[in-house]
Amino acid sequence: MSNMMKALVKSKPEVGLWMENVPVPEVGPNDVLIRVKKSAICGTDVHIWNWDQWAQKTIPVPMVVGHEFSGEIAEIGSAVTRYHVGERVSGEGHIVCGKCRNCRAGRGHLCRNTLGVGVNRPGSFGEFVCIPESNVVPIPDDISDEIAAIFDPFGNAVHTALSFDLVGEDVLVTGAGPIGIMGALVAKRSGARKVVITDINPHRLDLARKLGIDHVVDASKENLADVMKAIGMTEGFDVGLEMSGAAPAFRDMIDKMNNGGKIAILGIAPAGFEIDWNKVIFKMLNLKGIYGREMFETWYKMIAFVQGGLDLSPIITHRIKIDDFRDGFEAMRSGNSGKVVMDWM
């Protein structure tokens, strides 16, 4: 194996990514080197491409980015015992310290010292990625490489949707991006009564309909209260999944929640994001922030959802070769795509 590989690198502090030859990551005693077969583009990667304020504050330059992937093990460290060369795997992109209170209590997703693959350390937009053995997730034979490559965002959706009991509940999802749609699918499959998803992007709304969401609302044209009445809802929503990061959508959600309703919040809010906190108080709402996946219960559940028949393939709207990565990022930046999966093989 050559000691060099091609990778997408944030090599300059400006808009874009660049394909370069970089050293293959070194494998420590407890590490696993994975030959990447498929990579998916995340919204985080778009922020890095755009070199926005968050990226400028967060991403060291140069950096191999990317964190959504699947592949097979190419090399294992001397102390690795659970995996073998050639095994099909994906990986958890949040690397935790294992020493803080939350880690030692089995709540690794709450680690204060989390490092992000492709954010704080070299990522998966390369021919190889190296992660600790503890972050490796084996992929069953009945799950394809491209579905495994989108398990990271699917895990965000599963973590968000399963934050609260859904059986018999009426659920509102604000934001029909890929994660919002997958969250709505999880809610529907988990026994929710009514599942309503809202957005203002026609392409995303069409994609939600294509994937079988029953009640798809264009918030720029339709009144949510009228939709609730039309589908037989006499009280507010029991559970809200906020995936948009848009203040108008979140405010509308708060207005439409039943007293005592529960809201899981994954959408990242911009500066100046304002809501009416008196409504939160007097409606006695329960708000929960979500970041990443619960390790590794969320992974177990998302694998089970797919093996149980949940078809995520329509959420992948673009399949491209890695050398055409610019086309993939253009599709993502347009807002008119679902997931974009890039083939390294």
Curated annotation (Swiss-Prot):
It is found in: Cytoplasm. GO terms for cellular component: cytoplasm. The keyword NAD applies. The keyword Magnesium does not apply. Binds 2 Zn(2+) ions per subunit. It comes from the Bacteria. It catalyses: L-threonine + NAD(+) = (2S)-2-amino-3-oxobutanoate + NADH + H(+). GO terms for biological process: L-threonine catabolic process to glycine. Homotetramer. This is L-threonine 3-dehydrogenase. It comes from Rhizobium etli (strain ATCC 51251 / DSM 11541 / JCM 21823 / NBRC 15573 / CFN 42).
